[in-house]
Amino acid sequence: MPNEFELAVAALQRDGVIAYATEAVFGLGCDPDSESAVHRLLAIKQRPVEKGLILIAADLAQLQDYIDLDQLTSEQLARVEASWPGPFTWIMPARSNTPAWLTGQFTTLAVRVTAHPQVQALCRAFGKPLVSTSANLTGEEPARRVADIGELLASQLAYILPGEVGGQANPSEIKDARTGAIIRPS
């Protein structure tokens, strides 16, 4: 019988959208390389593609196919790396081949290396980062427990990975890697 990670990875490989615990809230995730999965996630969230999305990864290496580290100075990269793994999301220059279904209207991409052990294990088992957005409809309170994921939302998910959110009170802070400007405070 498959374990919970195997079921979650199988759902991701079938272009499904899953829910999983992150540092502060439950997230919705999917395969960032699957346009159909990303559009399914956006439809569930009722979120416009133009806003762009966040990728969450087990380590920086998992993000290198999506972000252009050559556009950062060594000081900028050091600042980013010093905050990871952790609840810090950075806006980084996207590679020219990073799809618009991830970047939205931008030439940048929001990325995070998670400190949440279950998410790290999930990204490692899947072999790449996940699209990550809060498990709620746009404008509603995010889910902090499996029980908080509404029936409407749950019915549209391929799998809900049981787990506990980390100790963060708020979703991750978002900063611009080049300027250090805070886009969303924690």
Curated annotation (Swiss-Prot):
It comes from the Bacteria. One of its GO terms (molecular function) is tRNA binding. PROSITE patterns: YRDC. One of its GO terms (biological process) is regulation of translational fidelity. GO terms for cellular component: cytoplasm. Residues 2-186 form the YrdC-like domain. It holds the Pfam family Sua5_yciO_yrdC. It catalyses: L-threonine + hydrogencarbonate + ATP = L-threonylcarbamoyladenylate + diphosphate + H2O. Its main location: cytoplasm. It is found in: Cytoplasm. Keywords: ATP-binding, Cytoplasm, Nucleotide-binding, Nucleotidyltransferase, Transferase, tRNA processing. Its EC number is 2.7.7.87. Belongs to the SUA5 family. TsaC subfamily. Required for the formation of a threonylcarbamoyl group on adenosine at position 37 (t(6)A37) in tRNAs that read codons beginning with adenine. Catalyzes the conversion of L-threonine, HCO(3)(-)/CO(2) and ATP to give threonylcarbamoyl-AMP (TC-AMP) as the acyladenylate intermediate, with the release of diphosphate. HAMAP family: TsaC (MF_01852). This is Threonylcarbamoyl-AMP synthase. It comes from Aeromonas hydrophila subsp. hydrophila (strain ATCC 7966 / DSM 30187 / BCRC 13018 / CCUG 14551 / JCM 1027 / KCTC 2358 / NCIMB 9240 / NCTC 8049). The gene is tsaC.
